[in-house]
Amino acid sequence: MKTTLILSTALTGMAFVASAQEVNVVSWGGAYEMSQVEAYNKPFTAETGIRVNMIAADNPATPLKAQVEAGNVTADVFDVEVSDAIRLCDEGALIEIDHAALPAAPDGTAAVDDFVEGALLDCAVANIVWGTVISFDTTKFDEGAQPQSAADFFNTADFPGKRGLPRNPKRTLYLALIADGVPAAEIYDVLGTDEGVERAFAKLDTIKSDVVWWEAGAQPVQLLADGEVSMTTVYNGRIFDAMVAENKPFEVIWDGQYMDMDMFVIPKDAPNMEAALQYLKFATDTQRLADQAKYIAYGPARRSSAELVGLYQDGVTEMAPHMPTSPEALENAVMDNPEFWADHDTELTERFNAWLASS
């Protein structure tokens, strides 16, 4: 309760107090981090005088846990996935957040009613909705005969070339089931059975020799750009940046999108707690989340922000069709299920790693 009270007190005031403080934010690097710098950090520093130091990590939850366990917390705000936010909160690593103290929408709607479902947790506040999607190099396939579905991703006979997949079961097993005909709404029911797990691995077996495994978010875009793969799964914001900002000949397949949210959390014993609390409030208000969509194709976690999403920073590209929350993107999308993975992550990861090691 004490940490909740501190947060509530810090967020209640309408204005920020300028100081010579700094706040250390751990995020994911790349185009996503750049979007945070432009939408959150620069205006935050201009308004408060607080310098924002960005630290990139392949998975910010990893250094957060390590710092807490070592008793040496050096960063203040971490951008993590939902499942990690839940786990770290349960482990007592994070402060609790008073949602009533978060900024209301411009029309006065309380934050608890303005954030999308699942965006507010005991110890976390979501900032974006994002997706892992399939992308392909259009130059690798004849016009009029290009891949269109998750099933095509697994069809190397008609759509030849190497495939990029993440080296983890969460964003790999589901796609195998989608490609094998399982509807998105039934993925967790099927994957929760022994038969479903066998079915997923059997489907992965069909392309195992053609897979190039990736771990960091920047890798799949580079794999496509270097011609090492003809198709890959990739974070939708990363591939949007390559397509629009860098004019790469890539396209997105929304079929079988895996949707997730990123959330801001603050560890207990953060060295710049007051600045961290100010940053959390600032970065999750309606306008800042809408502004982020000018720089990357991730959907804001507030309903009031979605109404303000317009053009990309080039002043030409409409962002709405590129959002993971667009109607086309949602047609056969799978939403992350933290409860499922809390129950099954260990066993499926062990099975996945054993499968990787097998011939």
Predicted regions, residues:
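Extracytoplasmic ligand-binding site segments that recognize negatively charged/polar headgroups
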Residues: 30-35, 81-219
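A bilobed periplasmic-binding-protein/Venus flytrap-type ligand-binding module shared by bacterial periplasmic
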Residues: 135-140, 177-179, 261-273, 291-294
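A ligand-binding cleft/hinge motif common to bilobed small-molecule-binding domains
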Residues: 85-87, 231-249
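Gram-negative bacterial Sec-dependent N-terminal signal peptides
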Residues: 1-20
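Periplasmic-binding protein-like
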Residues: 197-206, 244-270
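Mature extracytoplasmic/periplasmic domains
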Residues: 267-332
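Early extracytoplasmic/lumenal segment of secretory-pathway proteins
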Residues: 21-87
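Conserved C-terminal helix/tail region of periplasmic/extracytoplasmic solute-binding proteins
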Residues: 326-359
